Swiss-Prot record:
It comes from Leishmania infantum. It comes from the Eukaryota. Residues 296-323 are annotated as: Disordered. This is Large ribosomal subunit protein uL10. GO terms for molecular function: large ribosomal subunit rRNA binding; structural constituent of ribosome. Ribosomal protein P0 is the functional equivalent of E.coli protein L10. Transmembrane segments: none annotated. One of its GO terms (biological process) is cytoplasmic translation. Coiled coil: none annotated.
Length: 323
């Protein structure tokens, strides 16, 4: 049987070899995961990754020693800094090393998710709702429902839940009454699995929030950004590949409006036909709308000229009255 020192040395060599050989490290949570489940996950990952457990104090010392070596790479030093800053090597966690895509590893972990009953004292990872309907329980067992304030009635000799009831919320501690009722209803509400907490990939640390982002979310953010940039460029009059089309259309509309207002006709691009259509109100869009105030502008001086004699007569009449 190897000594403790030899075992630690072999563990250190394996951990350093994995940190050097693989570009991606997944920090995974192991809460409520049983040994058989861990064994099954390790066997499924055998061709894709290496799964390592161990004392976090020992792992931290090995990572720190690797970063303080004379020939330590900048990435090794940065990895140690990130582990210390975010306290990655702590709690009931494991390490998965791989060069494959993270999605391949998470798909294996999801495939080994196990359904479990709610045990007394366990922390609920999800909301648990008891659905309405017949329970198949005899009327003598209504006390279990009364303890949780669940409205029931007797129908066809069986206890029936009137309305659905939430018995657990995320973070709640399972008490004896809730655990007993869920067991009698044959409800196993919890799912446990090796859960990815964070990922170190080629010198970049991705947190749990980063990992929750999907390709659709990233695509939506990029499209919104491109739309905002295009709107700013269009408003500022800066031609780009996405704004040159609308800018040319707006410029042509302005030319057509000027043509309508000044009686100038241009033959290019069906200018004469479009001008006649705008004058006759047959052209939809802002061209005819822009042409209306321009065409109405010359009529304003003539209207003012007609009003001038009336104003002058009133002025003369008023002056004559004074003298």
């Amino acid at each position: 049987m190897p000594s403790i020192t030899t075992a630690k040395r072999e563990y250190e060599e394996r951990l350093v070899d994995c940190l050097t050989k693989y570009s991606c490290v997944l920090f995974v949570g192991m809460d409520n995961v049983r040994s058989q489940q861990v064994h099954d996950v390790g066997r499924a990952l055998r061709a894709k990754a290496e799964f390592m457990m161990g004392k976090k104090t020992l792992q931290g010392k090995i990572v720190e020693k690797r970063a303080q070596a004379k020939d330590a790479s900048p990435e090794a030093k940065h990895f140690n800094d990130q582990c210390e800053e975010y306290n990655l090597l702590s709690g009931n966690t494991g390490l998965i090393f791989t060069n494959n895509a993270v999605q391949e590893i998470t798909s294996v972990l999801d495939a080994h998710r196990v359904k479990r009953a709610a045990r007394v004292g366990a922390i609920s990872p999800c909301d648990v709702i008891v659905a309405a309907g017949s329970t198949g329980m005899e009327p003598t067992q209504t006390s279990f429902f009364q303890a949780l304030n669940i409205a029931t009635k007797i129908a066809k000799g069986m206890v029936e839940i009137v309305t659905e009831k939430k018995v657990l919320s995320v973070g709640d501690k399972v008490d004896n009454s809730t655990a007993t009722l869920l067991q009698k209803l044959n409800i196993s509400p919890f799912y446990y699995q090796v859960n990815v907490l964070s990922v170190w990939d080629r010198g970049v640390l991705f947190t749990r929030e980063d990992l929750m982002m999907t390709e659709d979310m990233v695509e939506k953010m990029l499209m919104e950004g491109l739309s905002n940039v295009a709107a700013m460029a269009l408003g500022a009059g800066i031609p780009t590949s996405s704004t040159i089309g609308p800018m040319l259309v707006d410029a042509f509309k302005n030319l057509l409006a000027v043509s309508v207002a000044t009686s100038y006709e241009f033959e290019e691009h069906n200018g004469k036909e479009l001008r006649e259509a705008a004058i006759n109100g047959l052209l939809a869009g802002s061209c005819s709308a822009a042409a209306e105030p321009a065409a109405a502008a010359p009529a304003a001086p003539s209207a003012a000229a007609k009003e001038e004699p009336e104003e002058s007569d009133e002025d003369d009449f008023g002056m004559g009255g004074l003298f």
